[in-house]
Amino acid sequence: VTAPALANPAYLAFATDAYIKYAIENGREDTKMQAFKNALSPEQIDNLTAYIRSLTSGWSPEPRELSPYPEPKDYVLNPEGKNPDFTIKQDRYVPMAQVEKALKDKNKLVILDTRTTSEWHNAHIPGAIPIPYYISEDKVASGLPNDDTWIIAYCSCPHAASDKIINMLRKKGYKNTAVIDEGFFNWINASYPIIGGKTK
């Protein structure tokens, strides 16, 4: 999956009308969606934008199978890959573009989704482990490697929940830790890859 569908409820919950219209007019990079700016009139594009927006509440998705929780053996993505070369701001925050590039380059890293588990089931960054912000401190590091592997957390806040988890890990001696600076909503709006439950 290279980008969420325009009718994806998670996408519609956060995408603005202007962003939807832009996607219709100009297409979406690295996807099969073509540009319709020269194929449709401005009125038709406005009508299509309004229709897609209406799917926020009027679209009934097919039943979904919940994504299975990752096993500890699968926590590290690309375990044989190189460590990513991140630029960390304020000793904590990493630009989402660098994380997306690390995934494309098959770098070694761990990604933590610190939102609620229901949000993780709905949509998450590929390979992300659900470690909700309300997890107890004695369980937060369960199964996580404490070596040179980068551990990257994200939330929707865009910092509060992931900051909490990273603080807990740092107290336990985890050094290569960071938070996706822009948060999950901006990850979606950038059309970066997300996955969720499969339709039955």
Predicted feature locations:
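Extracytoplasmic/secreted cell-surface and envelope-processing proteins
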Residues: 32, 121-122, 161-163, 187-189
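Catalytic cysteine-centered active loop of the rhodanese-like fold, especially the PTP/DSP P-loop
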Residues: 141-187
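Flexible, polar/low-complexity N-terminal or interdomain linker segments that lie immediately upstream
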Residues: 53-110, 119, 200
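Solvent-exposed, polar/charged alpha-helical surfaces in well-ordered, non-transmembrane soluble domains
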Residues: 4, 18, 22, 46, ...
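Positively charged, proline/Ser/Thr-rich regional signature most characteristic
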Residues: 86-160
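Extracytoplasmic electron-transfer domains, predominantly the class I c-type cytochrome c fold
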Residues: 2-56
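Hydrophobic residues at beta-strand termini and immediately following loops
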Residues: 6, 131, 180
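Sec-exported extracytoplasmic/periplasmic mature domains
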Residues: 25-29, 38, 50-60, 104, ...
